[in-house]
Amino acid sequence: MWIYRSQKSKNPDNLLQLWRVRKDYRGPLKPYSQQFSYAGSIVICPEKFKTSFCARSFCAL
């Protein structure tokens, strides 16, 4: 039920804004900073999203 509510309340505009912020935060990918970037993307995700959702989204990029 929690997952259903969170999916229903998602705002596409806010999600796009989140992607922009994440891209700016991560900057260009470098081999030595990939692990840090992955951790940073999870931290930036809003608390209402589960980290698994953020991880899947990161893999889709």
Swiss-Prot record:
Tell me the GO BP annotations in alphabetical order: plasmid maintenance
Keywords attached to this entry: Plasmid, Plasmid copy control
Q: Quote the function comment for this protein.
A: Controls the copy number in gene replication.
Q: Spell out the protein name for this chain.
A: Protein CopA/IncA
Q: Which organism is it from?
A: Escherichia coli
